[in-house]
Amino acid sequence: MNASQNKYPSVVLGLGKDGKEITHTFGLREAVALMAGTCGNGRSVLINRILTQLIAKYFSDGIQFIIADTIGISFNSYKGLPCLIKDPLTKPEEIREAMDWILAENERRLASIKESDDKKKAIENLPAIIFVIDEYSYLFKRGIFETKDMGSFLRNFVKLSRYTNTHVILSTQRREKEFIDTLNLSYMETRMIFHCLDERESERLISSPDAVNLKQDELLYMNRGMNEPVFCSFENFTDKDVKELIKSNNLVNLGEE
């Protein structure tokens, strides 16, 4: 890859209590990341920080994105970018089609790997696909999805994504125990948890009561292999910042032409 010495895309989430950078790498086994917490505490801001870093660093490596914007107001600035497989999706039917597409893409990639003489190199050469589903609980409120549909999707996705360099970020503010538990947290080894209303909810989401003490633009981060979560804070990142970063990196925003 040209953009980084890492084989797989990485981003800076923010700073820890010691002032050092907290980074996340979209490695083969980091298939699904869960962002959860109360409304207005920075989930969309962090998604924008992640997306803009990935676009700036890995655009030339062929990284691609699918953005499901279930509310329809958070990610319009990305419309027309060449690295989007489709413009941000807002309709439940479109999002379901995208979920089916990425499962099929996993199958296609796996078939290609099996045909390769150097399977390790074939895997490393696959450009990453990042599928963001923001406020995914809205899909269920609009009557197109049931929680079992998302559970089935995640189960089938995780099965192959460890070989195919495809990744999902799920973001939600919905906090009902039945809703979260139905999705099976074992599929979500990466957790980025924002402010929670009570310690029980915090414990369930990230095995720590400390998310109740978080403020805006703060989170607890935990990934596969970590024994406990780490604190992370980040700066606000506005829609204007997104547009300026896209322009400064000479990326053509077809939506403005």
Put a short name on every predicted segment.
Residues 202-203:
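Conserved beta-strand-loop-alpha-helix hinge in the C-terminal portion
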Residues 116-124:
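Short, highly charged C-terminal tails/helix-capping segments
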Residues 1-115, 127-130, 137-197, 206-215, ...:
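P-loop NTPase catalytic phosphate-binding loop
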